Regions:
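Short sequence/structural segments immediately N-terminal
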Residues: 1-125
Length: 125
């Protein structure tokens, strides 16, 4: 989402900070734990960050699943998608996702960041 063919650039807060006031404040409080990790050496080197990448990603995926991928939906909305303009496989997947009540993060993990080492994750995560 940072570099793409359309030139529209999503920055960190677009995906990681809710727009509504109360959810935004809750997210900022939770982010203090991440700041603590950086300051006190838990994730202060690339190696330590990589060692914690899966846990951090799973926490973020859970947050996005719990809020129905709201930050994605600020820009992307099933209701306004023209699936006829999409590649056939994407259209089928989006139509099925709507029927199954899925949210963006169910299929689009790794859309903006490289995925962590997924060997410890059970298939179909």
């Amino acid at each position: 989402h940072y570099n793409n063919r359309s030139g529209v650039r999503a920055t960190c807060p677009d995906c990681h900070v809710p727009h509504e006031f109360v959810p935004k404040m809750i997210r900022k409080l939770k982010a203090s734990k991440e700041l603590y990790g950086k300051i006190f050496g838990v994730i202060d080197t690339p190696q330590k960050f990589e060692a914690h990448r899966l846990t951090m990603a799973q926490n973020e995926w859970r947050r996005m699943k719990d809020n129905n991928s709201q930050e994605c939906r600020n820009c992307h909305n099933f209701e306004y998608m023209d699936t006829t303009a999409q590649k056939s496989v994407a259209a089928k997947m989006h139509d099925q996702a709507v029927k199954d009540g899925q949210t963006c993060i169910d299929c689009h993990k790794g859309i903006a960041h490289k995925l962590p080492d997924m060997r410890e994750v059970e298939p179909g995560f």
